[in-house]
């Protein structure tokens, strides 16, 4: 026969074993729950960090693009400045061109070819006398007017038909300069 104490010991051992198993299960469930929560938090914050990194990259790319455009504008502005300096230098050297014999012969040739009686000839203020002498030499009846916008050459207005022919140095210089701009840019900046 088993004594009460032994029986109590067996019952206690049996209950301890059941309690131990239950505690092990509870501990395992708690660890799984903690692991799931940790994984969930990790996924959430990893996604948030990825989102923040992506947003920061987009902001950096946007700023880089803005700065690239700003640099290109600055470079283009500087190039235009130097091209305009070349143009201004060309305008300043027009005095030499206007004093040349070739220029005077060209001007007279244009008047001889294009002038009609009753025309109005516009020229620069410093060439009025010269143009009047040329017209007188051609025995044509035309009015000569100065135009402060004209740097040289002439504009001939045919009042009877409402037509103006432009042989001014302004137009010629603009056309030649525009056509030579790529070559000038290549010389100045090493570009095509």
Curated annotation (Swiss-Prot):
Superkingdom of source: Archaea
A Pfam family reported for this protein in Swiss-Prot or TrEMBL: vATP-synt_E
GO CC annotation: plasma membrane; proton-transporting two-sector ATPase complex, catalytic domain
Record-level GO BP terms: proton motive force-driven plasma membrane ATP synthesis
Membrane topology: Peripheral membrane protein
Subunit structure as annotated in this protein's UniProt entry: Has multiple subunits with at least A(3), B(3), C, D, E, F, H, I and proteolipid K(x).
Protein name: A-type ATP synthase subunit E
The organism of origin for this protein: Metallosphaera sedula (strain ATCC 51363 / DSM 5348 / JCM 9185 / NBRC 15509 / TH2)
